[in-house]
């Protein structure tokens, strides 16, 4: 038995799981050639970030496009940063947007799939099996350096102007300890971590092909990275290498902030005898800073929209958020959407190679436009159901009003909907209260403010004249014809073109007359079809509102 084998036995004991056992437990997946296996692997350290939804969508689309699979893995090795219900927050965040995975964690303590456990803290036996093999082969060793000693090394490097800082070369004090020294210190109970023994050379370069960014050249890794912490829990760098191998990940898709870690990850894959996966490093999700006008990364602290829960609370349909993210993922999505207006966004032929290299800009105005288009294609019944579900949790008063009379509420959302160009007033369900308030007396507050070109006296005259001809039974054409008829006696022309030719000859035109009537009934200058609104409100409420407006203008 070699010293390395004796060291491995001292560190991990006899027997136990071996890498060969893991190979049998987690065989190749047997998917069709070219099928991609991707994973989304968040840490339960807080809410699901919009960048997380962006990344997960990239993983899912990549796998689906190739006939592969995507799994959800929870990377919970950093217990200090883990928050209570962090896993549930991630799972619920995905559920709110209809995001599903083929395998992996499905809830707190639940999962599905043959390559689990899908939570890293439950896979320690696997990491120890691989770490033990690395020790046996002389590729890993125990390091007894204290925090103070490591700080001393870093200070020495920084003061000496070293190009690279870290535990390597002459600063790797425990790298070449004799087995006898290692054994003595372990048996004495000295705490230690396990480090990877790098064979990198700072003068050599590595090259790898990033699917999004093309060929990337970087210095080799020379750092003897920690792979097991003093409590035996693996570091992120080591755990994900083992997991991606035994879960048979073919494509590692992650944020561009991980590019600098690729050399150490490739070194670990090769040292373990694992096949190196394909890499794709996605751009960060950015926004324009309101104060400086410069682009910056979305901030959990500054930007409420950084959390996907924000879009749920605001009432954005899940389809709207997913579709908007699609526009960020591939620049040709919008062209595809115009050519396929009725297709599901999941039918889009997503391509990693068409992702932007620079940061993609999250634009709330653009999201609102996308969402208005999505909602405009919904039926009145679909809109009603969606709003009711949202309002039940976030606006109890609105929920009570809408659920009181379903037919009436659906009638509201039917106005200007079944037509070639449906209105696009609503971007999120939170906006519905403002949209429907004049249909419900309980939340309606009259506003009698007139346009500058119409005096209160003229407004009162228009409304009194309208009351003379008003008939709730009139169809739309008859109703509007009557509005035109009352124009001339009041000094207004029923012909807008005539007014534009000779504005001094009239007080205004039929549009001004209609505006006064619209304001009296809804307190809005812009609404869906006014005739339809009148039919829904009914004769009594229309008369009451007009009469109240007349009193206001004559007072």
List where the protein language model places each region.
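N-terminal Rossmann-like or analogous alpha/beta NTP/dinucleotide-binding catalytic cores
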Residues: 2-162, 260-274, 320
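Glycine- and acidic
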Residues: 38-45, 71-76, 246-252, 305-308, ...
